[in-house]
UniProtKB/Swiss-Prot annotation:
UniProt cross-references to PANTHER family, sorted A to Z: RECOMBINATION PROTEIN RECR (PTHR30446:SF0)
Protein name: Recombination protein RecR
Zinc finger (C4-type): 57-72
Keyword match Zinc-finger: yes
InterPro entries named among the record's database cross-references: DNA_Rcmb_RecR (IPR000093), Rcmb_RecR (IPR023627), Rcmb_RecR_Znf (IPR015967), TOPRIM_dom (IPR006171), TOPRIM_RecR (IPR034137)
GO molecular function terms noted in the UniProt entry: DNA binding; zinc ion binding
SUPFAM superfamilies, per the entry: Recombination protein RecR
Native organism: Ureaplasma parvum serovar 3 (strain ATCC 700970)
Gene that produces this protein: recR
The keyword Zinc belongs to this UniProt entry's keyword annotation: yes
Domain Toprim: 80-176
Function: May play a role in DNA repair. It seems to be involved in an RecBC-independent recombinational process of DNA repair. It may act with RecF and RecO.
Amino acid sequence: MSKPVEFEMLVDALKSLPGVGTKNANKWAFFLLQQDQKYIDDLIKRIKEAKTNILKCKYCANFTNKDECDICLNEYRDFTKLMIVTTNEDLERIESANIYNGLYHITNGEISLRKNVVIEHTNIKTIKERVLNGSFKEIIIATSYTHDGEVTADYIIRMLEDIKDLQIYRIGFGIPLNSSIDYADDETLKQSLINKRKIRN
């Protein structure tokens, strides 16, 4: 049975969300169209308010409503350690596991020729300047164990190779191949940090 073109356009828009396939997109589209106008207006309003008022920390790119996020402002964090993660979800996942007390740097993407994602499309290019301007002694690269994640990790390692007195680590065994941090449980994350591989002294 054919559906109105507007319905198909809504489904296509919903499919652009992470992890949403055709089946769930259709389910959500039917759900939204069955709601009253107030529900739709409130939903749109909240999305617009979040997009307008939520900023990115000027240091790590974490979501905040100030120039600096609570993590970067927390004087009890270990300012000698910097963990490089791909997404805000990765940061939240590690924080919820309560296994790390350093600072973060969110790349907002991984280098991918397949997806046409280059350095300029990410926050990778700001890593070196931040390391040079900070007091970091240890860098932990926690990009995913996918092809794109490995390419990104290698690029970051090369970018930082001329900085003296900097130890560089890659998260260790525990995170499955072709997987990312947000799918790992607390124990797996803990083991990946315990077993982190030293890339450079």
